[in-house]
Amino acid sequence: AYFPQNVAMNKGVIPSVDEVKQKSLRPLPPEDFEHIAEAEGALVLDTRNAEVFKDGFVPRSINIGLKGDFAPWVGAMIPDVRQPLLVVADQGTEDEVVTRLARVGYDNVLGFLQGGIDAWRASGREVDTIERIDAEEFAARLKQAPLHVVDVRKDGEWENGHVQGAHHASLQYINDHLHVIAPEATNYLHCAGGYRSMIAASILKARGHHNLVEVRGGFNAIKKTDVPVTALMCE
């Protein structure tokens, strides 16, 4: 895969991973974390699992889980490798996060949230959440009333079968598909398994869309229910 760092590498400006770690592995208490985020215009990257992220996160943070296609999606969602970043990570994974970011050119990590989201909560600061439901609950709600469903999978996945009546907004081009997001109705987001849809939900939430519900297990789980889907071309 092509990462933005290729351009910078060609210019010979990429510091070593060890140099990056020395600068970036900096524990920041909540007050410092918040101050730096505002002063530096830093993007807060939360690398925890979606299942944990949904229950509480720093407002306007983006969730790209470390235990998934982490580097490719960081490259797709954060095109500027010079973007200042602040990290929220599971305790003990901070080194891995900074290392993996540095390897694909993201060397401007300003530190990580010391004590994680628990410390942020304990400091009395605001925490955001995203509702996540099982495919069975999604099916039950769909029986009660029409839903505004947004499928964030890639074009080929969508064409191979999708929820009838759903709208398509591929995650990698989500900023070009904001017109698909309903401003008033609740948006039910899903991908294939739940990783990409939480990335999408976090991005949309950061952009001010709070009427979001994400479907756990994605289309793989949805198609096992009685939710009407278009003909599946391949399994």
Region annotations inferred by a language model:
Residues 1-22, 39, 50-235:
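Rhodanese-like catalytic fold shared by cysteine-dependent sulfurtransferases
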Residues 21-33:
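A contiguous, basic/glycine-rich beta-loop/short-helix subdomain that forms a polymer-engagement track
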Residues 35-36, 41:
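Long hydrophobic segments that form regular secondary structure
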